[in-house]
Amino acid sequence: MKFDDRVYQFDAVPPLSSEDLKSPFARFYQVPVMAPAPAILAAIGPEQLDISNVLAFSKIEWLFRPESTALKNGWCILPDGTGYSLITTDMPGVAVEEEQWWPQWIMDPDFGYLNYRIWMPGLHVSHGTPIVEDLGWGASEVQMFQPLFPQLLGLSAEPKTLDPAYVGMIGSSGRSNLQGHPEQMDYTVLINCVKQTETGLRVQSVCYMGVKWQDGQLVKVHDVDPAKQRLFATHNAYEFQRKAQLLPELYAFSASMPNHGLNPNVRLPIKL
């Protein structure tokens, strides 16, 4: 775990191996992780979000409307014992083509999934099957077993009709367990909605923890430990801030490389 009361312990990340250092992207691993905006740091503090500010899954269409800017950031445990968080990250200077480039770049298995490790040094391990990362409570195996698309969410219209600023969505119903403990599963439904702004892009990431997707609905699987929900929100906030921090420079750096630095053997399971 590399978070200490919302502070990313960058000085504790493991060094790169001599093989890792052969990657043209190795220098980006050394770039210190930038903290989220002060308002987001406040939102992932110990105080839980008021239930009245939760985006219920039955109202998920709000995420795809212009009014989504009014959604409140934060985390909480819902009355039924499941968890919730929503994190908004502005990504100034990030273009749509850079956002579309990113998923294939992080999935490259070369140099021991170094690209994925660059994203969150010391927390991200590999992007295979399963994905291995530390969500804040130890190295976990993450499985995304049900991709989610706008067509599955019961929206009243196409996302681009609901909001012309809409760029794309990546969502899934998944589960994770601490390595070596497959009996301790945490279920999560995660939806990341990306839109254009005047200065770049904005991503809003909503998490429903303790549930799984089934027949168009969220079905409760287990209660959620408040500490875990808060740590998940913290991890989420740092992930997207780190992406906003690195992406423009990474994309420009790779421009002179064959295939813009992407591994042609990597195929995306979900396309933005």
Regions found by a protein language model. Give the residues of each.
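Residue-level detector of alpha-helical recognition elements and their boundaries
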Residues: 114-115, 200-202, 258
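Hydrophobic ligand-binding cavity/cleft-lining segments
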Residues: 2, 8, 12-14, 20, ...
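A conserved amphipathic terminal alpha-helix motif
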Residues: 45, 210-214, 218-270
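Sequence termini and other peripheral, non-core segments
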Residues: 1-32, 255-272
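A generic structural signal for well-ordered alpha-helical segments enriched in polar/charged residues
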Residues: 105, 150-154, 241, 245, ...
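Glycine-rich portal/gate segments that line the openings of hydrophobic small-molecule binding cavities
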Residues: 118-185
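Beta-strand/loop substructures that line and gate deep hydrophobic ligand-binding cavities in soluble
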Residues: 3-18, 175-234
